């Protein structure tokens, strides 16, 4: 009999403790954000959707070197190289499957031209998986992104069609490395 009364008192105490806890949570700051109405705080280095940027001249920065596709651990990037009349490389097609992408940022680190950049955009929900495959036209933005003054071909140099190397203005003659051998 005493055990029965003790169990009732213990159960009542548990219920009262739960009510006090629920009542106390009603006056505290909420832990949950009402997402669409309230903006979400993103850290400065947040890695979201991938974009392709342009150089200061307005051309595509991507030179189709394929380093991003090799660095991708899940293989969600595919591209094919093409060449313009002046010898500049560009991707004929550039495709990213965002249903496989883990947003690790290795493609951004591997890119020598800073063409691939990760943005803080994370709202990419789709009803069909095929809609998560982005083509080059979907990825290209109109601006230079994080590095506005960098132009890969200005830094790396590019041969001018019809002229031998070393004959351009302010350019030194190329060194024949085979003549340096003993």
Swiss-Prot record:
Enzyme class label: translocase
Cofactor(s) this protein requires: [4Fe-4S] cluster
Gene Ontology CC annotations of this record: plasma membrane
InterPro entries the UniProt entry points to: 4Fe4S_Fe-S-bd, 4Fe4S_Fe_S_CS, NADH_quinone_OxRdtase_chainI
Quaternary structure (record): NDH-1 is composed of 13 different subunits. Subunits NuoA, H, J, K, L, M, N constitute the membrane sector of the complex.
NCBIfam families found in the cross-reference section: NuoI, PRK05888.1-1
Keywords: 4Fe-4S, Cell inner membrane, Cell membrane, Iron, Iron-sulfur, Membrane, Metal-binding, NAD, Quinone, Repeat, Translocase, Ubiquinone
Protein's name according to its UniProt entry: NADH-quinone oxidoreductase subunit I
PANTHER family attached to this UniProt entry: NADH DEHYDROGENASE [UBIQUINONE] IRON-SULFUR PROTEIN 8, MITOCHONDRIAL, NADH DEHYDROGENASE UBIQUINONE IRON-SULFUR PROTEIN 8, MITOCHONDRIAL
EC number: 7.1.1.-
UniProt-listed PROSITE patterns: 4FE4S_FER_1 (PS00198), 4FE4S_FER_2 (PS51379)
Cofactor: how and how many bound: Binds 2 [4Fe-4S] clusters per subunit.
Membrane topology note: Peripheral membrane protein
Binding residues annotated for [4Fe-4S] cluster 1, in chain numbering: 62, 65, 68, 111
Keyword match Amino-acid biosynthesis: no
A Gene Ontology molecular function term of the record: iron ion binding
